[in-house]
Amino acid sequence: MKSFGTHLQEAVDEKKYKLVILSHDDPHDPNETWILIRDKAEALGLKVLLAEFVGTYTKKTPDGKRFIHSFGLDKEGKVIMPSAKNKNVEYAKPFEIDPSDTLIMARGIGTSAKSGNRSWGDMCKVFEYEGYTVINSTECHNICNDKWMNNLIFKRENFNTPKTVRINHPEGAKWALGELNADFPLILKTAAGSRGIGVMWIESEKALHGLVQLLYREDEYIDILIQEYIKTDYDVRVIVCAGKILGAIKRPIVDGDFRSNVSQGSEPELHELTEIEASESIRAADAVGGLLTGVDFIPAKNREKDKPYFIEVNSTPGLMGIESTLSGAAAKPLGKKLKEEGTSITTEILKRFLDRKLWVGSKGK
């Protein structure tokens, strides 16, 4: 007779899925998170395909089966792509996928107009049209990769967010300042950008005017935003997965800077959310249609009563910083729980999707 533990393990095994991680590993911006996700997924017994967007394509066979074709990987998990020295185009074994058992994580798509390759998003749309669960949808990526669109969503859904105005042309700085109606210093941002890149500190109208003209000279189609500066010692990143908060860290402002990105040198700490911070973070993730997001906010002075200032939602959150922070925070409730269970936040994300009710479409239920 089988034990209860055996039955439980079999029930979990029945829910295991295939995981396709589509991403772009830029040599100037190495992608460590996709390796982390792959390793944690394989430890759970999931079948994983790590596919570089460059060179990847998908097609159906005559009998209706769909496969993903991608370049192979070396022993370190790096993609083996054709080059001037190695012109041989060698694809790995085709990877069969089906909406009923395959979860697709799309990372690094960028915006169709500014970064990435439009065909990458088009490929993800094919998967969406056929009922696959794609984390995250192309619509979610389009919103999250555009800071202005983020801001419009926040305003429409009645979130607390810093006052923000878009500068529409090279001579638009003075008009935008009048619309913003905020004191210097201000924050200037390009609508596309991540990891704190494209975010600048502005102390005068003269400096703003000069910088706006310079940016438009470099790119006549650039979207520039100015935003009121909210004084703070730190901001908060919350990982929200399918309507559930799995972790939160506070990122102190970098010494001698005004940014708090881990990539800019901030050393994160575990953050205990208030009820209003937690509920508003879940609402922000839902507002952009995200299944797995990083929600960024600046805390209110009265954290227990007032809504935080939401900055943006990230549709491809890096997990390295929060992984290391939580693993080193065994004294805190969440860190202690993860350590006792021998798990991690990435593992918890992957385990959450064992529940097919969280998948998109009837085939995933």
Residue positions per predicted region:
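C-terminal active-site "lid" helix and adjoining low-complexity regulatory extension at the edge
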Residues: F4, E272, D286, G290, ...
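Structural motif
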Residues: K18, T102-L103, Y309
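Active-site nucleotide/adenylate-binding loops and adjacent lid/helix of ATP-dependent enzymes
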Residues: L19-H24, W34, C124, Y129-E130, ...
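Conserved N-proximal alpha/beta basic substrate-recognition cap immediately N-terminal to
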Residues: D26-K163
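Short glycine-rich anion-binding loops that position phosphate/pyrophosphate groups of nucleotides
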Residues: I109-T111, A191-G193, T316
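Protein kinase-like catalytic core scaffold
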Residues: L186, G247, T293, Y309-E312
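Proteolytic processing junctions in secreted/extracellular precursors
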Residues: K2-E14
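Phosphate-binding site of ATP-dependent enzymes
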Residues: I197-A284, V288
